[in-house]
UniProtKB/Swiss-Prot annotation:
Region Disordered: start-end pairs: 1-81, 325-392, 556-642, 856-955
Composition bias, Polar residues: 332-342, 556-565, 598-608, 878-900, 920-933
Residues in the DNA-binding region annotation: 453-554
InterPro entries according to UniProt: B3_DNA-bd (IPR003340), DNA-bd_pseudobarrel_sf (IPR015300), Znf_C2H2_type (IPR013087), Znf_CW (IPR011124)
Binding locations of Zn(2+): 717, 720, 738, 750
Protein's UniProt name: B3 domain-containing protein Os07g0563300
Pfam families per the UniProt record, alphabetical: B3, zf-CW
Subcellular location: Nucleus
Annotated Gene Ontology cellular component terms: nucleus
Sorted UniProt keywords: DNA-binding, Metal-binding, Nucleus, Transcription, Transcription regulation, Zinc, Zinc-finger
Biased composition range(s): Pro residues: 1-20, 29-45
Length: 955
């Protein structure tokens, strides 16, 4: 009877829908809550129990087929890789999910309990990646770090000089950290391992796009250390609004207007750079953020902002508490974020103009010298910007560039100079700007004015050459880089707002460059600058325009400011200067220059301008001749462009300068130790003599050894120029006389005779030829007459002889030797040369006299031949106006000549050997007849006639 009851147990195999449905969806093999069949689920356990108890073989293959699925998917279904760790062999347990590190696609690595325990305690790589490459040692403590793994990216930092360092050592040294390959490691500085992981998971959010991590990496490395550090700190240590840093899908580059942040490494991290970041926020219309919200500085680098009020939906519930996450970051005392200044973007009181809402220490930093109410024309918006920049700067740059100088600049609201430029440029190029000038520079413009450098105009810069030489380091630091010598045109704005186009180029100079601005003459003339004045160069940010200002010389500013200074001592407004215009409200408005630079008042009519010009000229001391008109309204042109007083040429022929004609080795011999005994100091076995007084300049002496072998020295008296013999150890002062001779009482007076004559002394002492002539020149100076131009040939011969001064200066060429006889080298400077007496018997004077005697004899013969032949002779200047009779008239030719001519004829003779110096009164004085040809004596030159007329008897 039991046989009919067999069909009911066969229903489970017949009930094919459950297995078919299970086989139709083999991918959904997951835990029970993910099964897609809720109705048969409660009936399946009883059927399974009955099937196991009645007939286990039939349901077992179907159940295995249901779990395995198709043959192609059999291996992954047999050994499911649930744990994300590739080195973990244990499948995932029934426990909750364990989140590990974040993946590149935005998901999290799902780990088992064992792997998660290793990851949580920071030993994941030490447990599973010991055999994997990429291990390096910490440069400080030697700890092993896995640098080639995404799991350990938060455990180390990159050093600037190369190598890596663990986070603990980096926290101790407070080193500036560079970003890692994908994420910044600076966010983990103030947290332990567990807090680092939690904060990393909560705050990190990947940007959209296919190459998000690569774009983030390139963007970080293209910025400076300051930018990347600021960007990453604001991105991870603070809870930024959702979507503010997102990129549009497919965007892998930065716009051109964002590229100006990339060159911030060329500028110092001064408040100007931070003000520029905060000011850029209002320029782009992001007015929803507060000025003290630190998340906005990160938003500037990613301009694809969305609604900042939306929360990040990628964060799980309970993990996006802004205040909790922020407190977790700032609670650590080692954190670089100040805990006294609460950076929370949800406090509306900071947006108000209430002074009580301003944090302590910020309101006083921006007050000017005029009082706490004057904020240097800074509105509420600018005040918030400066407070934000100051707070950010105190947080991120407290160990780098903040010093007393920059704190003083913060009080003025503008930087004086770039910190990098101050360390590179010479002090004479530093822009010297006072607080008042800085206040007028800021004006009503929202732009930041950064003084770059200044340069004093030289005579060539202020001349008509049309070029301004720039300091090399200043040009390379602030002007565009040029590779060709032709350069490029450069637009520069002057103090009145007018734009000038200069040619910025360089000249190759000894493997270097000399940078110049060409075409600056019209600009300098419009500013009425001259040599000695100073031109200043500044930069207007963020436009990057160059501003060329000026400042008058200090020796003229006091006198020029006198007419325009008011009686009450208050500086006049900008309208009182004709070199400064009222600044416009536009960003490109002219920058007003300092008040003390300008010296003239602005006039509204030509008459007032002429009056002002007269007043300005009357305040300056001018040298005007008798024909100079001082009432002209036009500016008087300067004849000389030299700076300061005119430097006269140093005359080397003066008696005082003769003492300087010694070499450096000879000057060392003149140094004598002080009279006091020195103190002996032994340092490392070496004895040193220390004197309390400096060495003195002693008298020059000559050490001589006589025939008997005795050593002594010879010195010359300062008064009588006599030589005295002194002991070897005698130390003489610079003004030594015979009265100071305490070693020889017989010759302690200038009246005493010299021991030996000059010939014997010259054999022992190497006296220069100029030494004796120097003393003789003092006596015979009054008896020497000025030589004339006819002695040029004599000068050449004298310079060739050894009797003259060897150091006689001439206007010779730079590379000519001292014995050069060219027309340039033989000319003495300023017409001064060797002087000869009338009775001089040197070779040159004798040669000149013989030459003159020969010329006179030839002339007499010619005149005699003319008289004999009856050829009419040309009238001379001294002849009378009577006509010369022709030959055959019966009258003697000499009877009709003038008395002067007769006297000249009688005066000519062989005994005439000298030239009278009275000839210097002739109109042809000091002239050389270069056209004179002795072989052509038929024509007489006027010079020879004048010489013959002024000649007298040599006796």
């Amino acid at each position: 009877m039991s046989s009919p009851a067999q069909p009911p147990p066969t229903r489970p195999p017949v009930a094919a829908p459950p297995p078919s449905l299970a086989a139709a969806a083999p991918i959904s093999v997951q835990p029970p809550p993910l099964q897609p069949k809720p109705p048969p689920h409660p009936q399946q356990p009883p059927q399974a129990v009955v099937s196991v108890g009645v007939g286990p073989p039939p349901p077992t293959p179907q159940h295995q087929q249901q779990q395995q699925g198709p043959p192609g998917h059999a291996p992954p279904q047999q050994r499911p890789r649930i744990c994300f760790n590739a080195h973990c062999k244990d499948p995932k347990s029934d426990g909750p999910r364990r989140r590990g590190w974040r993946l590149r696609n935005g998901d999290f690595a799902e780990l088992c309990d064992r792997c998660y325990h290793s990851f949580e305690h920071g030993g994941f790589c030490e447990t599973f990646h010991l055999e994997v490459a990429g291990w390096r040692n910490c440069e400080s403590c030697g700890k092993r770090l896995h640098c080639g793994c995404i799991v350990s990216v938060h455990a180390f930092v990159h050093l600037d000089a190369g190598g890596v360092e663990c986070v603990m050592c980096a926290r101790k040294s407070h080193a500036a950290m560079a970003p890692s390959q994908i994420w910044s490691s600076s966010m983990h500085m103030a947290q332990n391992v567990a807090d680092r992981k939690d904060n990393f998971v909560k705050s990190w959010r990947p940007p959209a796009g296919q190459f998000s991590s690569q774009w983030r990496q390139n963007n970080m490395w293209s910025m400076s250390t300051m930018q990347s550090d600021l960007q990453q700190r604001l991105a991870f240590e603070f809870d930024r609004p959702s979507g503010s840093e997102k990129l549009l899908p497919g965007r892998t580059f930065i716009h051109a207007h964002e590229k100006k942040f990339d060159d911030m490494h060329d500028r110092s991290t001064t408040p100007a750079g931070m003000n520029q970041i905060m000011r850029e926020r209002y320029a782009n219309g992001h007015t929803q953020h507060t000025t003290l919200d630190p998340t906005y500085a990160y938003t500037l680098y990613h301009r694809e902002g969305t609604n900042p009020n939306l929360h990040d939906h990628s964060h799980h519930a309970g993990e996006n508490d802004h205040l909790t996450a922020r407190k977790g970051v700032t609670s650590d005392p080692c954190s670089s974020v100040s805990t006294t200044f609460k950076l929370d973007s949800h406090h509306p009181s900071i947006l108000k103009d209430d002074p009580s809402a301003v944090p302590a220490g910020l309101s006083s930093n921006f007050s000017s010298a005029n009082g706490p109410k004057d904020h240097i024309r800074i509105g509420p918006t600018q005040q918030q910007q400066q407070m934000a920049s100051s707070s950010l700067q105190k947080q991120f740059y407290s160990h780098s560039v903040i010093d007393n100088d920059f704190q003083a600049q913060l009080r003025n609201g503008r930087p004086r100079m770039d910190a990098k430029a101050r360390s590179q440029l010479l002090p004479r190029y530093w822009p010297r700007i006072t607080d008042q000038e800085l206040q007028h520079l800021s004006g009503d413009s929202n732009s930041v004015i950064t003084p770059l450098f200044e340069k004093m105009l030289s005579a060539s810069d202020a001349g008509r050459i049309g070029r301004l030489v720039l300091p090399k380091k200043c040009a390379e630091a602030y002007f565009p880089a040029i590779s060709q010598a032709e350069g490029l045109p450069l637009k520069v704005q002057d103090a009145t707002g007018k734009e000038w186009v200069f040619q910025f180029r360089f000249w190759p100079n000894n493997n270097s460059r000399m940078y110049v601005l060409e075409g600056v003459t019209p600009c300098i003339q419009s500013m009425q600058l001259q040599a000695g004045d100073t031109v200043t160069f500044s930069r207007i940010d963020p436009e990057g325009k160059l501003v060329m200002g000026f400042r008058k010389a200090t020796n003229l500013s006091a006198e020029q400011d006198q007419p325009t200074k008011p009686a009450n001592g208050v500086l006049p407004p900008p309208e009182a200067n004709n070199k400064v215009v009222v600044p416009d409200s536009s960003p490109n408005a002219a920058v007003p220059r300092p008040i003390k630079v300008n010296t003239e008042s602005k006039s509204s009519s030509p008459v007032e301008q002429a009056t002002a010009c007269k007043i300005d000229k009357g305040a300056l001391p001018q040298k005007e001749g008798p024909g100079t008109s001082s009432s002209s309204p036009l500016p008087v042109k300067r004849k000389a462009t030299s700076v300061g007083p005119k430097i006269k040429r140093f005359h080397m022929d003066s008696e005082e300068s003769m003492e300087l004609k010694i070499t450096w080795e000879e000057a060392q011999e003149l140094l004598r130790p002080p009279p006091k005994a020195p103190s002996i100091v032994v340092v490392d076995g070496h004895e040193f003599e220390e004197y309390e007084e400096p060495p003195i300049l002693g008298r020059r002496t000559y050490f001589v050894t006589d025939q008997s072998g005795e050593n002594h020295q010879w010195a010359q008296c300062e008064d009588c120029s006599k030589w005295r013999k002194l002991p070897v150890d005698a130390l003489l002062p610079s003004k030594w006389t015979c009265s100071d001779n305490k070693w020889d009482s017989e010759r302690s007076s200038c009246d005493s005779a010299q021991e030996i004559n000059m010939e014997e002394l010259g054999e022992m002492i190497p006296i220069k030829p100029g030494a004796a002539k120097k003393t003789k020149g003092k006596v015979d100076t009054d008896n020497i007459d000025v030589s004339d131009g006819l002695d040029t040939l004599a000068n050449l011969a004298i310079l060739g002889e050894g009797e003259s001064l060897p150091s006689q200066p001439t206007t010779r060429h730079p590379r000519h030797r001292p014995g050069c006889s060219c027309i340039v080298c033989i000319q003495p400077p300023s017409g001064k040369g060797p002087k000869h007496k009338q009775t001089c018997t040197c070779n040159v004077c004798m040669t000149v006299r013989r030459r003159f005697r020969t010329l006179m004899m030839r002339r007499e013969k010619r005149q005699q031949s003319e008289k004999d032949s009856g050829v009419p002779r040309k009238r001379e200047p001294g002849q009378s106006s009577e006509p010369v009779p022709q030959s055959g008239s019966g009258a003697h030719p000499t009877s009709t000549s003038s008395p002067h001519q007769r006297a000249d004829t009688n005066g000519e003779g062989p005994e005439d050997m000298s030239i009278d110096n009275k000839r210097t009164s002739s109109p042809v004085k000091n002239q050389i007849d270069l056209n004179s040809q002795p072989e052509r004596e038929d024509e007489q030159s006027p010079k020879s006639d004048a010489t013959r007329l002024l000649r007298d008897n040599p006796t």
